Amino acid sequence: MRATVLGAGSWGTALASLLAGKGYTVTSWDKDAAVLDDIARNHRNERYLPGLHLPPTLHASAEVAKALEGAELVVLAVPSHAVRPVVIEAKRHVHAGTPIVCVAKGIELDTLMTMTEVVEDVLPVPLHPYLAVLSGPSFAKEVAKGLPTAVTVAARWERIAKQVQDAFHTKTFRPYTSGDVVGCEIGGCVKNVVAIAAGISDGMGFGANAMAALVTRGLAEITRLAVRKGANPLTLSGLAGLGDLVLTCSSDLSRNRTVGRGLAEGKTADAIQRELGQVAEGVRNARSARELAKRLGVEMPITEAIYRVLYEGLAPREAVTALMMRETKPEL
């Protein structure tokens, strides 16, 4: 099989390495020439996955047309804000029948579309049925190291979900299939916002009780938004919902949790992301998820609080107090 991965960041490179490790011929494309040169010459990506050796069947190209030539599988692994321009550039070189796997997590701010909705907005209609989402508790570094991981692959066509599942399945990477694309997308996007809240809680020393409350109530508001968008609530109890949320809220590998800890220390989100050197999607997603919730009439108090901390200068401790002092109500 020939596969193309658009985006050579940590997640794109980890998935490209996984596919190449199965013996597929894989080409990585990116805007960053230095990263592509490192992959092509040294079989490494020291910027995003330092110290890891990449398979020799993983190649690199700076030209979209060349990278997509003959591709039987396309993986879209760019940051959420880059999805639309990259798909616009790539669409002439993708053909009907080729599965397109979106692993970007976000809601486009201008349109409030999920990532698959953005892709469908750009691609010709005959390509829409071949679109799939891969999401779940999966840090790139651990996948690249071959540590056991389970994810969800969602597509409207069961055949496409199964095809993508088979393409990615290895002895250390286990995909489950689903038909709930929107549930997987909302779960994968909004958990990043809750993870910022988790980082703030940890950074301020609020303890295990607070963390358990955040994860539980965070899942509740993620589920409300997803269901309003048409998702199956059970999806949010699975890998793409609860699984991804628990991982992102609890691990030091989480960039969004790191942002929260930095905010608790008095740093700005911009300064924290500069230190990280990578995108923390929750910073953007706090704005877009809040706007989508307002449009759909969904109450999302944790998301609202994080938005106010990031964009209105609300002190993290005041945000916590505001959450705790909201009007009391039944849990369910």
Swiss-Prot record:
Keyword match Nucleotide-binding: yes
Disulfide bonds: none
One MF term in the entry's GO annotations: NAD binding
One Pfam family recorded for the sequence: NAD_Gly3P_dh_C
Reaction(s) catalysed by this chain's protein: sn-glycerol 3-phosphate + NAD(+) = dihydroxyacetone phosphate + NADH + H(+); sn-glycerol 3-phosphate + NADP(+) = dihydroxyacetone phosphate + NADPH + H(+)
UniProt entry tagged with the keyword Nucleus: no
GO CC term (a single one): cytosol
Active site: K191 (proton acceptor)
Cellular compartment(s): Cytoplasm
Main location: cytoplasm
Keywords linked to the UniProt accession: Cytoplasm, Lipid biosynthesis, Lipid metabolism, NAD, NADP, Nucleotide-binding, Oxidoreductase, Phospholipid biosynthesis, Phospholipid metabolism
E.C. numbers: 1.1.1.94
This protein's pathway: Membrane lipid metabolism; glycerophospholipid metabolism
Biological process terms in GO annotation: carbohydrate metabolic process; glycerol-3-phosphate biosynthetic process; glycerol-3-phosphate catabolic process; glycerophospholipid metabolic process; phospholipid biosynthetic process
Binding site for NADPH: S10, W11, K31, K105, A140, R255, V279, E281
Chain residues that bind sn-glycerol 3-phosphate: K105, G136, S138, K191, D244, S254, R255, N256
Enzyme class, spelled out: oxidoreductase
Role noted for this protein: Catalyzes the reduction of the glycolytic intermediate dihydroxyacetone phosphate (DHAP) to sn-glycerol 3-phosphate (G3P), the key precursor for phospholipid synthesis.
PANTHER family found in the cross-reference section: GLYCEROL-3-PHOSPHATE DEHYDROGENASE, GLYCEROL-3-PHOSPHATE DEHYDROGENASE [NAD(+)] 2, CHLOROPLASTIC
Family that this chain belongs to: Belongs to the NAD-dependent glycerol-3-phosphate dehydrogenase family.
The protein, known as: Glycerol-3-phosphate dehydrogenase [NAD(P)+]
